[in-house]
């Protein structure tokens, strides 16, 4: 049986933690930031952890990571 391919786009967006959870960076923090409030931009800087439901989906995309 052939090896499962790792989704390269998912591997660049998500990092696995030691507890088999995945952390990710928020969207909308690259450009056009002048309209956004300081509070909003500060919350976008914080890395978040995926929910359990999405965690199972990402595990299929990242079998070896």
From Swiss-Prot:
The keyword Plastid does not apply. Keywords: Ribonucleoprotein, Ribosomal protein. GO terms for cellular component: cytosolic large ribosomal subunit. It holds the Pfam family Ribosomal_L35p. PROSITE patterns: RIBOSOMAL_L35. InterPro entries: Ribosomal_bL35 (IPR001706), Ribosomal_bL35-like (IPR021137), Ribosomal_bL35_CS (IPR018265), Ribosomal_bL35_sf (IPR037229). One of its GO terms (biological process) is translation. GO terms for molecular function: structural constituent of ribosome. It comes from the Bacteria. Belongs to the bacterial ribosomal protein bL35 family. NCBIfam families: rpmI_bact. This is Large ribosomal subunit protein bL35. It comes from Blochmanniella floridana. The gene is rpmI.
């Amino acid at each position: 049986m052939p090896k499962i391919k790792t989704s390269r786009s998912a591997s660049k967006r998500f990092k696995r933690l030691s507890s088999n959870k995945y952390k990710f960076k928020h969207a909308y923090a690259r450009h056009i930031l002048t309209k956004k409030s300081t509070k909003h931009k500060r919350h976008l800087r914080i890395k978040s952890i995926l929910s359990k439901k999405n965690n199972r989906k990402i595990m299929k995309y990242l079998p070896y990571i």
